[in-house]
Protein backbone atom coordinates (compact mmCIF):
# COMPACT_ATOMS: atom_id res chain seq x y z
CA UNK A 1 0.00 0.00 0.00
CA UNK A 2 1.38 3.40 -0.99
CA UNK A 3 0.73 6.45 1.16
CA UNK A 4 1.91 10.06 1.29
CA UNK A 5 2.87 11.54 4.64
CA UNK A 6 2.51 15.27 5.28
CA UNK A 7 1.96 17.54 8.27
CA UNK A 8 1.78 21.14 9.43
CA UNK A 9 0.03 22.64 6.43
CA UNK A 10 -1.15 25.62 8.50
CA UNK A 11 -3.55 26.66 5.76
CA UNK A 12 -4.86 29.56 7.86
CA UNK A 13 -1.36 31.08 7.82
CA UNK A 14 -0.26 29.82 4.39
CA UNK A 15 -3.37 31.34 2.86
CA UNK A 16 -1.84 32.35 -0.48
CA UNK A 17 -0.97 28.81 -1.52
CA UNK A 18 -2.89 26.86 -4.15
CA UNK A 19 -2.68 23.33 -2.78
CA UNK A 20 -2.30 20.39 -5.12
CA UNK A 21 -3.58 17.08 -3.73
CA UNK A 22 -3.89 14.00 -5.93
CA UNK A 23 -7.39 12.45 -5.62
CA UNK A 24 -5.91 8.98 -6.14
CA UNK A 25 -3.37 9.26 -3.32
CA UNK A 26 -3.94 8.04 0.24
CA UNK A 27 -2.75 10.89 2.47
CA UNK A 28 -1.64 10.61 6.08
CA UNK A 29 -1.80 14.11 7.58
CA UNK A 30 -0.05 14.33 10.94
CA UNK A 31 -1.80 17.35 12.40
CA UNK A 32 -1.93 21.14 12.20
CA UNK A 33 -3.97 21.54 9.07
CA UNK A 34 -5.34 24.72 10.65
CA UNK A 35 -5.98 26.36 14.01
CA UNK A 36 -9.70 26.62 13.29
CA UNK A 37 -11.99 23.61 13.23
CA UNK A 38 -14.24 24.84 10.42
CA UNK A 39 -11.25 25.75 8.25
CA UNK A 40 -9.82 22.29 8.90
CA UNK A 41 -13.10 20.57 8.17
CA UNK A 42 -13.69 22.43 4.91
CA UNK A 43 -10.10 22.01 3.74
CA UNK A 44 -10.19 18.24 4.19
CA UNK A 45 -13.56 17.96 2.44
CA UNK A 46 -12.37 20.04 -0.51
CA UNK A 47 -8.86 18.60 -0.95
CA UNK A 48 -8.51 15.08 0.45
CA UNK A 49 -10.25 12.21 -1.32
CA UNK A 50 -8.87 9.39 0.83
CA UNK A 51 -6.65 9.13 3.87
CA UNK A 52 -6.42 9.70 7.61
CA UNK A 53 -5.53 12.69 9.75
CA UNK A 54 -5.02 13.65 13.38
CA UNK A 55 -5.34 16.93 15.25
CA UNK A 56 -2.31 19.05 16.04
CA UNK A 57 -1.60 21.37 18.93
CA UNK A 58 -2.84 24.35 16.89
CA UNK A 59 -6.41 23.09 16.76
CA UNK A 60 -8.30 25.60 18.88
CA UNK A 61 -5.95 28.56 18.27
CA UNK A 62 -8.88 30.46 16.77
CA UNK A 63 -10.41 30.54 20.25
CA UNK A 64 -13.93 30.15 18.87
CA UNK A 65 -14.76 26.78 20.43
CA UNK A 66 -13.22 24.47 23.01
CA UNK A 67 -10.77 21.77 22.02
CA UNK A 68 -13.34 19.14 23.00
CA UNK A 69 -15.93 20.63 20.66
CA UNK A 70 -13.41 20.86 17.81
CA UNK A 71 -12.45 17.20 18.19
CA UNK A 72 -16.11 16.20 18.35
CA UNK A 73 -16.96 18.12 15.17
CA UNK A 74 -14.12 16.54 13.20
CA UNK A 75 -14.89 13.03 14.37
CA UNK A 76 -18.59 13.48 13.60
CA UNK A 77 -17.76 14.54 10.04
CA UNK A 78 -14.97 12.03 9.36
CA UNK A 79 -15.87 8.82 11.22
CA UNK A 80 -17.01 7.03 8.05
CA UNK A 81 -16.06 6.99 4.41
CA UNK A 82 -12.68 7.20 2.70
CA UNK A 83 -11.26 9.97 4.92
CA UNK A 84 -11.02 9.33 8.68
CA UNK A 85 -10.20 11.62 11.58
CA UNK A 86 -8.34 9.61 14.22
CA UNK A 87 -8.45 10.90 17.77
CA UNK A 88 -7.65 7.72 19.67
CA UNK A 89 -9.24 5.73 16.89
CA UNK A 90 -8.20 2.96 14.52
CA UNK A 91 -8.73 2.63 10.79
CA UNK A 92 -7.99 -0.66 9.01
CA UNK A 93 -7.56 -0.75 5.26
CA UNK A 94 -6.20 -3.65 3.24
CA UNK A 95 -3.60 -5.27 5.51
CA UNK A 96 -2.66 -2.10 7.41
CA UNK A 97 -3.96 -0.79 10.73
CA UNK A 98 -3.65 2.97 11.29
CA UNK A 99 -3.67 4.05 14.94
CA UNK A 100 -4.03 7.80 15.37
CA UNK A 101 -3.78 10.28 18.23
CA UNK A 102 -2.47 13.82 18.74
CA UNK A 103 -0.18 12.41 21.46
CA UNK A 104 1.16 15.54 23.26
CA UNK A 105 4.25 15.04 25.49
CA UNK A 106 5.33 14.03 28.98
CA UNK A 107 7.85 16.94 29.31
CA UNK A 108 10.42 14.34 30.38
CA UNK A 109 12.79 14.56 27.44
CA UNK A 110 15.59 15.91 29.65
CA UNK A 111 14.64 14.43 33.03
CA UNK A 112 13.42 17.73 34.50
CA UNK A 113 9.65 17.65 34.08
CA UNK A 114 8.69 20.60 36.29
CA UNK A 115 11.22 22.92 34.67
CA UNK A 116 10.17 21.93 31.16
CA UNK A 117 6.50 22.38 32.02
CA UNK A 118 7.20 25.88 33.33
CA UNK A 119 9.15 26.76 30.17
CA UNK A 120 6.34 25.46 27.99
CA UNK A 121 3.78 27.45 29.99
CA UNK A 122 5.81 30.62 29.43
CA UNK A 123 6.63 30.24 25.75
CA UNK A 124 4.07 28.06 23.94
CA UNK A 125 0.99 29.60 22.40
CA UNK A 126 -0.93 26.39 23.09
CA UNK A 127 -1.39 27.61 26.63
CA UNK A 128 -2.55 31.06 25.57
CA UNK A 129 -5.13 30.21 22.92
CA UNK A 130 -6.51 26.68 23.28
CA UNK A 131 -9.57 26.40 25.52
CA UNK A 132 -10.99 23.41 27.35
CA UNK A 133 -14.13 22.71 29.35
CA UNK A 134 -13.36 22.19 33.03
CA UNK A 135 -15.84 19.53 34.15
CA UNK A 136 -15.04 20.00 37.84
CA UNK A 137 -16.02 23.67 37.88
CA UNK A 138 -18.25 23.78 34.80
CA UNK A 139 -16.19 26.56 33.26
CA UNK A 140 -14.17 27.15 30.09
CA UNK A 141 -10.47 27.74 30.74
CA UNK A 142 -7.19 27.68 28.87
CA UNK A 143 -5.37 24.38 28.72
CA UNK A 144 -2.18 24.12 30.77
CA UNK A 145 0.81 21.79 30.87
CA UNK A 146 -0.93 19.58 33.43
CA UNK A 147 -3.88 19.31 31.05
CA UNK A 148 -1.76 18.19 28.12
CA UNK A 149 0.27 15.86 30.34
CA UNK A 150 -3.03 14.18 31.17
CA UNK A 151 -3.83 13.94 27.46
CA UNK A 152 -0.43 12.35 26.85
CA UNK A 153 -0.87 9.67 29.48
CA UNK A 154 -4.32 8.79 28.19
CA UNK A 155 -3.09 8.70 24.59
CA UNK A 156 -0.07 6.49 25.29
CA UNK A 157 -2.29 4.09 27.21
CA UNK A 158 -4.61 3.96 24.21
CA UNK A 159 -1.72 3.32 21.82
CA UNK A 160 -0.39 0.45 23.89
CA UNK A 161 -3.83 -1.12 24.27
CA UNK A 162 -4.34 -1.03 20.51
CA UNK A 163 -0.86 -2.34 19.82
CA UNK A 164 -1.61 -5.33 22.02
CA UNK A 165 -4.87 -5.85 20.18
CA UNK A 166 -3.25 -5.66 16.74
CA UNK A 167 0.16 -7.18 17.53
CA UNK A 168 -0.21 -9.63 14.65
CA UNK A 169 -1.06 -6.90 12.14
CA UNK A 170 1.00 -4.38 10.20
CA UNK A 171 0.62 -1.10 12.14
CA UNK A 172 1.15 2.55 11.21
CA UNK A 173 1.08 5.03 14.10
CA UNK A 174 0.00 8.57 13.24
CA UNK A 175 0.67 11.32 15.79
CA UNK A 176 1.34 15.04 15.80
CA UNK A 177 4.00 15.13 18.50
CA UNK A 178 7.26 13.27 18.01
CA UNK A 179 8.18 9.92 19.61
CA UNK A 180 11.90 10.53 20.04
CA UNK A 181 14.56 13.21 20.51
CA UNK A 182 15.94 11.97 17.19
CA UNK A 183 13.12 13.88 15.49
CA UNK A 184 14.29 17.22 16.90
CA UNK A 185 16.47 19.38 14.66
CA UNK A 186 20.09 19.63 15.82
CA UNK A 187 19.77 23.32 16.66
CA UNK A 188 17.01 22.55 19.17
CA UNK A 189 18.38 19.35 20.72
CA UNK A 190 19.47 21.16 23.90
CA UNK A 191 16.54 23.59 23.96
CA UNK A 192 14.20 22.58 26.77
CA UNK A 193 11.15 23.80 24.88
CA UNK A 194 11.72 20.65 22.81
CA UNK A 195 10.19 18.71 25.70
CA UNK A 196 6.87 20.09 24.44
CA UNK A 197 7.60 18.73 20.96
CA UNK A 198 8.84 15.20 21.60
CA UNK A 199 8.88 12.41 24.17
CA UNK A 200 11.07 9.34 24.47
CA UNK A 201 8.74 6.62 23.22
CA UNK A 202 11.38 4.50 21.54
CA UNK A 203 10.50 1.78 24.06
CA UNK A 204 7.17 1.32 22.28
CA UNK A 205 8.93 0.72 18.98
CA UNK A 206 11.38 -1.63 20.68
CA UNK A 207 8.54 -3.62 22.22
CA UNK A 208 6.28 -3.95 19.18
CA UNK A 209 8.05 -5.29 16.11
CA UNK A 210 4.96 -4.91 13.93
CA UNK A 211 5.01 -1.10 13.86
CA UNK A 212 6.21 -0.53 10.31
CA UNK A 213 5.88 3.26 10.38
CA UNK A 214 5.48 6.04 12.92
CA UNK A 215 4.73 9.33 11.20
CA UNK A 216 4.41 12.64 13.01
CA UNK A 217 4.61 16.40 12.59
CA UNK A 218 4.98 19.41 14.91
CA UNK A 219 8.75 19.96 14.70
CA UNK A 220 8.70 21.73 11.29
CA UNK A 221 11.86 19.91 10.21
CA UNK A 222 12.12 16.69 8.27
CA UNK A 223 13.05 13.48 10.04
CA UNK A 224 14.03 10.09 8.64
CA UNK A 225 15.33 7.37 10.93
CA UNK A 226 14.62 3.88 12.18
CA UNK A 227 14.04 2.44 15.65
CA UNK A 228 13.99 -1.36 15.69
CA UNK A 229 11.65 -2.34 12.82
CA UNK A 230 9.93 1.05 12.71
CA UNK A 231 10.59 3.78 10.20
CA UNK A 232 9.99 7.23 11.67
CA UNK A 233 9.01 9.91 9.16
CA UNK A 234 8.26 13.59 9.60
CA UNK A 235 7.39 15.57 6.46
CA UNK A 236 6.15 19.02 7.50
CA UNK A 237 5.20 21.82 5.17
CA UNK A 238 5.52 24.41 7.92
CA UNK A 239 5.13 28.16 7.53
CA UNK A 240 5.50 29.99 4.22
CA UNK A 241 8.70 31.71 5.36
CA UNK A 242 10.51 28.52 6.38
CA UNK A 243 9.76 26.19 3.50
CA UNK A 244 10.86 26.37 -0.11
CA UNK A 245 9.16 23.07 -0.98
CA UNK A 246 7.67 22.90 -4.46
CA UNK A 247 3.96 22.42 -3.93
CA UNK A 248 4.05 19.74 -6.64
CA UNK A 249 6.29 17.67 -4.37
CA UNK A 250 3.98 17.90 -1.37
CA UNK A 251 4.24 14.86 0.91
CA UNK A 252 6.65 11.97 1.34
CA UNK A 253 5.59 8.84 -0.51
CA UNK A 254 6.26 5.50 1.11
CA UNK A 255 5.23 1.95 0.31
CA UNK A 256 4.09 0.10 3.41
Describe the function of each predicted region.
Residues 99-172, 179-188:
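Active-site-proximal loop/helix segment associated with metal-binding centers of metalloenzymes
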Residues 5-7, 27-32, 51-57, 84-88, ...:
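Active-site neighborhood of phospho(di)ester-bond hydrolases with catalytic His/Asp-centered motifs
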Residues 50-128:
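A basic- and aromatic-enriched beta-loop-alpha substructure that forms the phosphate/nucleotide-
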Residues 1-4, 90-100, 169-170, 226-231:
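Beta-strand-turn-beta hairpins that frame and shape the catalytic cleft
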Residues 77-83, 158-170, 203-214:
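A structural motif corresponding to the C-terminal end of an alpha-helix
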Residues 1-53, 58-69, 145:
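N-terminal active-site segment of His-dependent metallophosphoesterases
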Residues 24, 185, 192-212, 219-256:
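Binuclear metal-dependent phosphoesterase catalytic core
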Residues 10-16, 34-39, 58-65, 90-92, ...:
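Active-site environment of divalent metal-dependent phosphoester hydrolases
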Amino acid sequence: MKIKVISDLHVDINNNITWNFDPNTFYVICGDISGDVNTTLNFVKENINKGVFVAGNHLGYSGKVTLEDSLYMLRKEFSKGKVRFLNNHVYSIKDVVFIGTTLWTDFNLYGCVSECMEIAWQYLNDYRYVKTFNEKFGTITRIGPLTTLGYFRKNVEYLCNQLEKYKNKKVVIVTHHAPSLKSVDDKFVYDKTSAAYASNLEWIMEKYNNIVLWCHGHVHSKARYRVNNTRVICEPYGYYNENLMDIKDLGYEIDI
